């Protein structure tokens, strides 16, 4: 590939790329458009950043999301109007799920905008700020760059994205992108601790009194990961014998192979043992917890505030008393120090068993959801990155314990089906040394399958499992089991990788345990190529956790008039 010729003068576009590289971005996703082409030349010529073109802008946004979850930041480039709006669903998902993505939008030159003429990719009314106003609802920071303040505004948006762990939006006109400027004079300012010493001191006093000599239990969620304070939480967990659980959103946040791991807490949909351990804990620490409908069993959690220490991003509470400003990492370190200072070791506790060991099915046994996820979990190895789409794949996997060193990615709040396929591309590029395992349903795959060829082009070798249950099974479980709107077109799935340009791959169609076992054995052996497995399961078969969750959803009143859990949080 011939690199484009770039003028020697340093530009605003180069400044933006150098700042992204400084934050750890080595790939930028997107789809080219005429308002971005010159900026793309700078990307191609950049010494450390590569361009990764996608099949469409929505997929580019999903890929950037998957990359950002593992790298801590990501970027995509789309063109004005038509391109950015195609990516808006993905950006909204990143906002909902606290993923830092920088969305760079190429726009017409400023002088053309000033004429207020009906330029292509606009609404034709001469107003070129419609879309930045839309973006303000789904990003934490926005900038319409001008030549006078471009570099300052770039730094502001990137700093806000890094601080809030949410997307940012940069509108980059073609003339501003090529405008001369100076390279960064210094690195972006790092994180400054926003904790008040007085708030921390009062928090320690209150927490010490509540904890006393009682056993502590921890319930953790995804904000611990997004705010990069996992080590601080692990220090707390090793300061004593501390049982812990996570919500579905925080799955794989902590070691699930530990004898202290309780399992997944999902309110009334939890196992009885996990529910009792969390809801009856003498002292419960909730770290980075956000109760959403689907991860809490439709808000059926029973958490008593009087026995709870809640640790949030910028504030913490002990019982009914709030302490702010107090950053999460500082609060977790303080709790660990309290356990160390008290010098009382809690006795071991009886915890629920891990994945139950069932009898190995016969090779001719027809596959079910339970057999599929049992066998898949047994095939995982440390280092795998598992992406489970928001369907039976997600709920089938979350109730299984993962090996240490496996990362799990799902999207239970935004829940945009098809998200995980392009996100797996981004995750694979974020950590090339870790093999991705992609799990999604047939209906979800039909939305984003165009990106499959990009895996081969980028030299990635994922294991892809498409669950063929002949349509939208979760919707069938909620309403309309035989309704035509829950049907989809039937595809020849094993032909698709080759049709989309994946030259080096192995495809399997598994209806029995023996066929599934063979496919996974080949996947374990062939680590340098894509292994694509179509798995046939009954149309109305559900994982047990999903069965528990869909009971309240079957009553439409429960969807919109959710029960009051009886506690404040």
Swiss-Prot record:
For this entry, list what GO says about its biological process.
Answer: aromatic amino acid family catabolic process to alcohol via Ehrlich pathway
Keyword Magnesium present in the record's keywords: the answer is yes
Organism of origin is: Mycobacterium leprae (strain TN)
Q: Which family does it belong to?
A: Belongs to the TPP enzyme family.
The record's comment on cofactor binding reads: Binds 1 metal ion per subunit.
Which cofactors must be present for this protein to function?
a metal cation; thiamine diphosphate
Q: What is this protein called?
A: Alpha-keto-acid decarboxylase
GO CC, alphabetical: cytosol
Q: Which UniProt keywords apply?
A: Decarboxylase, Lyase, Magnesium, Metal-binding, Thiamine pyrophosphate
**EC?**
4.1.1.-
Q: Provide the residue span(s) of the region labelled Thiamine pyrophosphate binding.
A: 392-474
Q: Which PANTHER family match?
A: PYRUVATE DECARBOXYLASE (PTHR43452), PYRUVATE DECARBOXYLASE ISOZYME 1-RELATED (PTHR43452:SF30)
Annotated Mg(2+) binding lies at 442, 469, 471
What is the protein's known function? Decarboxylates branched-chain and aromatic alpha-keto acids to aldehydes.
What GO molecular function terms would the record report?
Answer: magnesium ion binding; pyruvate decarboxylase activity; thiamine pyrophosphate binding
> Record-annotated residues binding thiamine diphosphate?
57
């Amino acid at each position: 590939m011939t690199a484009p010729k770039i003028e020697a003068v340093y530009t605003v576009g180069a400044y933006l790329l150098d700042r992204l590289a400084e934050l750890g971005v080595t790939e930028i996703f997107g789809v080219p458009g005429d308002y971005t082409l010159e900026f793309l030349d700078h990307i191609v010529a950049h010494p450390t950043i590569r361009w990764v073109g996608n099949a469409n802008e929505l997929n580019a946004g999903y890929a950037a999301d998957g990359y950002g979850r593992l790298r801590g930041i990501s970027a995509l480039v789309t063109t004005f109007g038509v391109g950015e709006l195609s990516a808006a669903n993905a950006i909204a998902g990143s906002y909902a799920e606290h993923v830092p993505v920088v969305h760079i939008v190429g726009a017409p030159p400023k002088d053309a905008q000033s004429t207020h003429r009906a330029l292509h990719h606009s609404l034709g009314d001469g107003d070129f700020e419609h879309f930045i106003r839309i973006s303000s609802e789904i990003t934490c920071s926005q900038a319409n760059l001008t030549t006078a303040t471009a570099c300052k505004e770039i730094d502001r948006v990137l700093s806000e994205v890094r601080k809030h762990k949410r997307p940012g939006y940069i509108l980059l006109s073609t003339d501003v992108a090529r405008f001369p400027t100076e390279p960064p004079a210094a690195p972006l300012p790092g994180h400054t601790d926003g904790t008040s010493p007085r708030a921390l001191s009062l928090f320690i006093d209150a927490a010490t009194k509540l904890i006393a000599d009682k056993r502590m239990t921890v319930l953790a969620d995804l904000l611990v990961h997004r705010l990069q304070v996992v080590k601080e939480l692990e220090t707390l967990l090793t300061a004593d014998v501390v049982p812990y659980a996570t919500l579905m959103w925080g799955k794989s946040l902590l070691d699930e192979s530990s004898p202290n791991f309780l399992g997944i807490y999902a309110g009334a949909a939890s196992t009885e043992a996990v529910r009792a351990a969390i809801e009856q804990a003498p002292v419960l620490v909730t770290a980075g917890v956000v109760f959403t409908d689907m991860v809490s069993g439709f808000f059926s959690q029973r958490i008593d505030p009087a026995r709870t220490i809640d640790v949030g991003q910028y504030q913490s509470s002990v019982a009914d008393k709030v302490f702010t400003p107090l950053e999460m990492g500082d609060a977790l370190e303080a709790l660990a120090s309290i356990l160390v200072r008290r010098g009382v070791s809690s006795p071991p506790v009886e915890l629920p068993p891990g994945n139950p060991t069932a009898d190995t099915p016969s090779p001719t046994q027809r596959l079910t959801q339970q057999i599929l996820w049992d066998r898949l979990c047994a095939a995982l190895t440390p280092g795998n990155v598992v992406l489970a789409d928001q369907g039976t794949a997600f709920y089938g996997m979350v109730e299984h314990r993962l090996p240490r060193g496996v990362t799990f990615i799902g999207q239970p709040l935004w829940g945009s089906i098809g998200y995980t396929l392009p996100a797996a591309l981004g995750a694979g590029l974020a950590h090339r040394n870790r093999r991705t395992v992609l799990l999604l349903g047939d209906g979800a795959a039909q939305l984003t399958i165009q990106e499959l060829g990009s895996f081969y082009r980028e030299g990635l070798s994922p294991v892809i499992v498409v669950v063929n249950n002949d349509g939208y099974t979760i919707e069938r479980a909620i309403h309309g089991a035989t309704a035509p709107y829950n049907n989809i077109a039937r595809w020849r799935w094993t032909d698709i990788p080759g049709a989309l340009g994946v030259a080096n791959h192995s495809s399997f169609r598994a209806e029995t345990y023996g066929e599934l076992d063979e496919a996974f054995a080949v996947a374990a052996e062939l680590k340098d190529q894509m292994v694509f497995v179509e798995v046939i399961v009954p149309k109305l078969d559900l994982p047990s956790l999903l069965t528990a969750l869909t009971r309240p959803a079957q009553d439409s009143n429960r969807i919109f008039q959710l029960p009051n859990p009886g506690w404040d949080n």
